[in-house]
A protein has these predicted regions:
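Hydrophobic, aromatic-enriched alpha-helical segments typical of multi-pass transmembrane helices
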Residues: 2-188
Length: 188
């Protein structure tokens, strides 16, 4: 099966590679942890936001048959997530109130990410286009991150970082899987 994208035929294998690359690219948003340079942070957050939206757009055709309502919810929330990342990146250019809104945006972003990631892994589990154990790992990581995010509302920010490790490891592994192995072609 071949998809037509902008008038050009694109194989499922190429889409899997691009999705894997976009997953890795979305983690460029973490650049803010290493620098305060506006020349690095702003473009990295904008690129990460666009990558998040790109993942959803590319995955939607594969996930739709596993639950149309959930797939629509997934792509909708991913657009919101990507938009928030872009806005937070642009707010980094300002000072005062807009700059101070970055932290609340990322608190909301965390919960939006958890919902979209949970929907993503449930849809991947149902579709079987990747091994189910990767999907289960993703669901467990989402639940763990939800617990960590709720705890962060009451306790130290440092605690949340521990809960991110499980989902980050899962997503980096998934990206590698998609780049190297691609989708289970029997299920697509």
């Amino acid at each position: 099966m071949v998809f037509v994208w902008d008038g050009e035929k694109v194989s499922r294998r190429k889409i899997a590679v691009v999705v894997g690359f976009f997953i890795l690219l979305a983690y460029i948003v973490l650049a803010y942890m290493f620098t305060d340079s506006k020349l690095i942070v702003v473009p990295s957050e904008v690129v990460a936001g666009l990558a998040v939206i790109g993942i959803a757009v590319l995955m939607y055709p594969f996930l739709r048959s596993s639950g149309e309502g959930l797939a629509f919810g997934y792509i909708s929330v991913k657009f919101v997530e990507g938009f928030l990342m872009i806005v937070a990146g642009l707010f980094f250019l300002s000072s005062g109130v807009l700059f101070d809104m970055r932290n609340p945006i990322y608190v909301w972003h965390a919960f939006i990410f958890i919902f979209s990631a949970f929907a993503f892994y449930v849809l991947l589990y149902r579709s079987r286009i990747i091994p189910r154990w990767i999907s289960v790992w993703g669901v467990v990581a989402c639940v763990s991150l939800l617990i960590g995010s709720v705890l962060e509302l009451f306790f130290s920010y440092q605690l949340l970082k521990l809960f991110y490790i499980l989902i980050m490891a899962n997503e980096v592994f998934l990206a590698g899987w998609l780049i190297v192995r691609g989708f289970n072609l029997e299920k697509v």
